[in-house]
UniProtKB/Swiss-Prot annotation:
<dbReference type="InterPro" id="IPR017959">
    <property type="entry name" value="Asn/Gln-tRNA_amidoTrfase_suB/E"/>
</dbReference>
<dbReference type="InterPro" id="IPR018027">
    <property type="entry name" value="Asn/Gln_amidotransferase"/>
</dbReference>
<dbReference type="InterPro" id="IPR003789">
    <property type="entry name" value="Asn/Gln_tRNA_amidoTrase-B-like"/>
</dbReference>
<dbReference type="GO" id="GO:0005524">
    <property type="term" value="F:ATP binding"/>
</dbReference>
<keyword id="KW-0067">ATP-binding</keyword>
<dbReference type="InterPro" id="IPR006075">
    <property type="entry name" value="Asn/Gln-tRNA_Trfase_suB/E_cat"/>
</dbReference>
<keyword id="KW-0436">Ligase</keyword>
<protein>
    <recommendedName>
        <fullName>Aspartyl/glutamyl-tRNA(Asn/Gln) amidotransferase subunit B</fullName>
        <ecNumber>6.3.5.-</ecNumber>
    </recommendedName>
</protein>
<dbReference type="Pfam" id="PF02934">
    <property type="entry name" value="GatB_N"/>
</dbReference>
<comment type="function">
    <text>Allows the formation of correctly charged Asn-tRNA(Asn) or Gln-tRNA(Gln) through the transamidation of misacylated Asp-tRNA(Asn) or Glu-tRNA(Gln) in organisms which lack either or both of asparaginyl-tRNA or glutaminyl-tRNA synthetases. The reaction takes place in the presence of glutamine and ATP through an activated phospho-Asp-tRNA(Asn) or phospho-Glu-tRNA(Gln).</text>
</comment>
<dbReference type="Pfam" id="PF02637">
    <property type="entry name" value="GatB_Yqey"/>
</dbReference>
<dbReference type="InterPro" id="IPR017958">
    <property type="entry name" value="Gln-tRNA_amidoTrfase_suB_CS"/>
</dbReference>
<keyword id="KW-0648">Protein biosynthesis</keyword>
<dbReference type="InterPro" id="IPR023168">
    <property type="entry name" value="GatB_Yqey_C_2"/>
</dbReference>
<dbReference type="GO" id="GO:0006412">
    <property type="term" value="P:translation"/>
</dbReference>
<comment type="subunit">
    <text>Heterotrimer of A, B and C subunits.</text>
</comment>
<dbReference type="GO" id="GO:0070681">
    <property type="term" value="P:glutaminyl-tRNAGln biosynthesis via transamidation"/>
</dbReference>
Amino acid sequence: MTYQAVIGLEVHLQLNTRSKIFSACPADYHGAGPNEFTDPLTLGLPGTLPTLNRRAVELAMMFGLGLGCDVSGFTQFHRKNYFYPDAPKNFQLSQYDRPIARDGYLDVPGEGGPERIRIKRAHLEDDAGKLVHPTYAPYSLLDLNRAGSALIEMVTEADITGPEQARAFLESVQAIAQSLGVSDATPEEGKMRCDVNISIHKPGEPWGTKVEVKNLNSFRSVARAIEYEAARQAKVLDAGGIITQDTLGWDEGGQKTFLMRTKEGEADYRYFPEPDLPPLDITPEWIAEVRARMPELPAQKLERYRAAGVRESDAQTLSLSVSLSKFYDEALKSGSDTQKPDAQKLANWLLTDVAGALAAQEKGVEDSDLQPAHLAALVGLIDAGTISGKIAKDLLPDVLAGHDPAQLVQERGLSVVTDTGAIDAAIDAAMEADPATVEKVRGGNAKAMNALFGPVMKAMGGKAKPEVVRERLTAKLGL
């Protein structure tokens, strides 16, 4: 039986603030020992009062604007009450019915063109601590360094239909957050986490009962959890069973979901307004000020790259990476007004040759010694006919190490040979060394000429233009 999946995502991003959202406790705890970044408010001690972090509010506003949301003029925090060891206050401060942003959208690439995913809301909240479960131990350990860190949670409408679309959406959200400087959005560091709500139904029938898969910490896990859970629900329904509204976890090792608890309803959390924080008024002037500080968004970069003549797949790749787009833009600007590097050729070199070489070193462009101006110069030397593509590839390791390609070409005498006399001499030597191939070519086997072409290029040290060699070789053979 064929089923259709209905999927919504809840994405949590840890905001780039120096201190936690409701206290002055430092928030840069990564790499620290357990429970080193706590304070009385983080620990939920009696008598402590929250103070809202202004930067967290502005980053949330910026993120909402980046998603095309309406920023609320009035918002407030509520206590979301629950009992769990990683929440020492026994409640989370979140924005219940007054989120800071709502009604946005994000267009993601699809097979038939852009596909729109609607954003229901984005709201601020404080993060929980972290439970560590030692293998085979009869206890768990609690680290509260993360507790109280500033989070923004973004909730989509149930517009997503499959794992690849979900992955494309998350990549776009990550690119927006990183481009704006709102969050590092690194799943491997826990700075971007995702919950998946998924149900299935037969075409034309009402939606089924949804389940929630919690705390997925990689885009690949999100995609695989969607695939597994859709298949599991289909198997249950085909066997005559029912789907219950549960909260599930994801077993990365077993590649399957598991039951965590029966899904709570809103009433279970007993939301009520936070009495120690006044409601927040956000003026149009404040919104305009934040909007004016926003850097270029990935969608704007994409349009700029398209206009420059970069092919769609490369433009998408560049626009989704802050480090690659920054490097590419600097390289593109580095040429003189009369000799700008070709936009597509530069993208080819950056995304293929450079990316491949750096991947082998387990580096990105931001970690390497490669200079944007040097890559632009390398592409420019090829375009100007000063060196061949082969010579450029041979020079790449040195260019990656920070050396100027123009200087290397001059020092090593690598400029393209334009002396046809030298090329003719190399051709004569190759023909004399392989008379059998010469006879084959003159006998009508034109493809056999490649057996002569290689030795000529080798004799010229790769410094002759291939088209010139082929032209001279053709003339020498009388073709």
